[in-house]
């Protein structure tokens, strides 16, 4: 799917794609007449996710949507409802749920390998110095929280194995009001969990961060650094064992292979659209906490956790 003829010609040759399977945005809805296409993967600027997920579902296709699911909780609900109405599977592009290091963090945390997780910390960000759609709120819906911070949200939840009950947050001072006139330059937040555990997180468009995820309990800790990239992931534990000495893989290939298997074998995806809705609820709560300076309850957030790795 592209409006750029040069790209269409390149991909046609590179991947041996038949002409009938090449579309542009004007012909998108004609997908309904093409049984050769089973899945649509929506990888557009955030504000366009809702429209194209709904249209893909209406065309009778299963859908994967990149993160964040949408730019509002209302749109996220609409997307989930559209896929349910169409009877099609709906998944979020949460590739790290299929990545060995992060899967092991899920297992260690949820199985309480170091006792109940009492504290988590996570950071993720990069230095953005030139204008792009990422700092245009009309397209992005927000700044680094929507882009890089969502990995911290995800990591803390799937490692702790719980959805937080409240959040506090604050925006960092804006170092470049011209560049960051529409979105935050950075934000810090803390999740509070029902058992007293906390998760301290940071995300930035002003700093190349290490992309770290750490979880500690009374008997030790586990850490990934880097935790969220497409390769080079590495981890360690307080016991200096080899539990996080794991291979790096093609994460998105694993993610897409799993979704194909879900469709072929009629089983649910471990990262359903509802998980993206959950995360939009949390992102909105973080923004509300930062804007008001008040602790915001998240007790009404969808209670959904990926327990696949911990169950193995």
Predicted regions and their residues:
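Beta-loop-alpha module in the N-terminal Rossmann-like domain of NAD(P)-dependent dehydrogenases
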Residues: 20-82
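Contiguous beta-strand/loop segments that form the cofactor/metal-binding neighborhood of enzyme cores
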Residues: 154-231, 253-267, 284, 301-312
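Hydrophobic residues in well-ordered beta-strands that form the structural core
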Residues: 24, 65, 90-92, 201, ...
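Predominantly a Rossmann-like dinucleotide-binding segment in NAD(P)-dependent oxidoreductases
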Residues: 96-180, 293
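Active-site loop of classical SDR/Rossmann-like NAD(P)-dependent oxidoreductases
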Residues: 3-7, 245-256
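NAD(P)-binding Rossmann-fold cofactor-contacting core
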Residues: 1-15
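C-terminal helix-rich "cap/oligomerization" subdomain common to oxidoreductases
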Residues: 39, 244, 261-312
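Rossmann-fold dehydrogenase core element
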Residues: 76-95, 115-122
């Amino acid at each position: 799917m592209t409006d750029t003829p040069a790209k269409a010609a390149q991909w046609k040759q590179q991947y041996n794609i038949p002409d009938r399977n090449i579309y542009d945005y004007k012909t998108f809805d004609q997908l309904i007449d093409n049984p050769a296409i089973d899945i649509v993967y929506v990888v557009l600027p955030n504000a366009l996710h809702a429209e194209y997920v709904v249209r893909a579902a209406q065309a009778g296709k299963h859908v994967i949507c990149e993160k964040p699911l949408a730019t509002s909780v209302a749109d996220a609900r609409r997307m989930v409802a559209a896929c349910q109405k169409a009877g099609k599977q709906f998944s979020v592009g949460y590739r790290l749920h299929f990545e060995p290091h992060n899967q092991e963090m899920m297992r260690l945390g949820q199985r309480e390998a170091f006792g109940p997780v009492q504290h988590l910390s996570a950071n993720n960000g990069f230095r953005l110095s030139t204008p792009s759609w990422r700092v245009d709120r009309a397209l992005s819906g927000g700044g680094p929280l929507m882009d890089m911070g969502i990995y911290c949200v995800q990591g803390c939840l799937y490692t702790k194995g719980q959805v937080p009950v409240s959040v506090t947050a604050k925006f960092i001072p804006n170092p470049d009001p011209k560049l960051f006139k529409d979105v935050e330059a950075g934000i810090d937040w803390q999740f509070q969990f029902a058992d007293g555990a906390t998760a301290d997180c940071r995300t930035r468009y002003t700093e190349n961060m290490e992309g770290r995820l750490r979880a500690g309990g009374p008997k030790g800790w586990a850490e990934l650094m880097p935790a969220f990239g497409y390769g080079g992931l590495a981890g360690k534990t307080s016991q200096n064992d080899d539990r996080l000495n794991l291979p790096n893989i093609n994460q998105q290939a694993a993610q897409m292979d799993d979704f194909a298997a879900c469709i072929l074998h009629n089983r649910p995806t471990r990262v359903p659209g509802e998980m993206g809705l959950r995360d939009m609820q949390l992102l909105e709560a973080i923004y509300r906490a930062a804007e008001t300076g008040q602790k915001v309850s998240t007790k009404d957030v969808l209670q959904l956790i990926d327990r696949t790795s911990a169950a193995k």
